[in-house]
């Protein structure tokens, strides 16, 4: 088996005017594609690894041979992180969570606005490249951030929502205005997908 880019559930321009077409196309066809290519190269001599879902690989890095562990961490993480990212974006997104996820967010963080403020702060404070996440850890929601392409899965945490704060995710449209990009993210969040991920992780 070889790892492949997931099919985008929308066109490159579908998230306009929030996320621009050029960034989406470059992000998917160049950046994500490179992670997939490099991951396939890393595991090419290890067919037993290539049979595993990428999420399983990054969740169990200790079982990856040491000579390719760094490559799998970086490129496998990049593949897993971006695959989730595309799925939790939608041209019909925005609004607020519903159901059990809404209740869990309010229980853990206060109001939805309180949650967004805390998530935004984590995303803005990540120095350099990385991600901000809403994760399930031991049945409870947490907000965490990771460096580079590190995945919460590697720490035993299941991501429900993730935001890429690498400059390649926003610089063409937002330049150095990361907080504006973070605010815009909420307009395109696919809460139906986040709900499904939360239900599966509980």
From Swiss-Prot:
Top-level taxon in the UniProt lineage: Bacteria
Residue ranges that the Swiss-Prot or TrEMBL entry lists as coiled coil: none
Cross-referenced InterPro entries: Mn/Fe_SOD, Mn/Fe_SOD_BS, Mn/Fe_SOD_C, Mn/Fe_SOD_N, Mn/Fe_SOD_N_sf, SOD_C_sf
Cofactor field: Mn(2+)
Residues the record lists as binding Mn(2+): 27, 82, 164, 168
PROSITE patterns to which the protein is assigned, alphabetical: SOD_MN (PS00088)
Keyword Nucleotide-binding: no
Cofactor remark from the record: Binds 1 Mn(2+) ion per subunit.
GO MF terms held by the record: metal ion binding; superoxide dismutase activity
One Gene Ontology CC term in the entry: cytoplasm
Enzyme class of the recorded protein, top EC level: oxidoreductase
Name of the featured protein: Superoxide dismutase [Mn]
Naturally occurring in which organism (per UniProt): Listeria innocua serovar 6a (strain ATCC BAA-680 / CLIP 11262)
Name of the gene encoding the protein in the UniProt record: sodA
């Amino acid at each position: 088996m070889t790892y492949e880019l997931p099919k985008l559930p929308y066109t490159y321009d579908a998230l306009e005017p929030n996320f621009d077409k050029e960034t989406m196309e470059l992000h998917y066809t160049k950046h994500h594609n490179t992670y997939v290519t490099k991951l396939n190269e890393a595991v090419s001599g290890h067919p037993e690894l290539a049979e595993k879902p990428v999420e399983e690989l990054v969740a169990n890095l200790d079982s990856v041979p040491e000579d390719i562990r760094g490559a799998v961490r970086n490129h496998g993480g990049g593949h897993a992180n971006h695959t989730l990212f595309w799925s939790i974006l939608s041209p019909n997104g925005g609004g607020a969570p519903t159901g059990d996820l809404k209740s869990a967010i309010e229980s853990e963080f206060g109001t939805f606005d309180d949650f967004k403020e805390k998530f935004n702060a984590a995303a803005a404070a990540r120095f350099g490249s990385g991600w901000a996440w809403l994760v399930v850890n031991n049945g409870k929601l947490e907000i965490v951030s990771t460096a580079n392409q590190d995945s919460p899965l590697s720490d035993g945490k299941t991501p429900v929502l993730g935001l890429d704060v690498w400059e390649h995710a926003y610089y063409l449209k937002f330049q150095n205005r990361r907080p504006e990009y973070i605010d815009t993210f909420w307009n395109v969040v696919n809460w139906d997908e986040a709900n499904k991920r939360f239900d599966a992780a509980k």
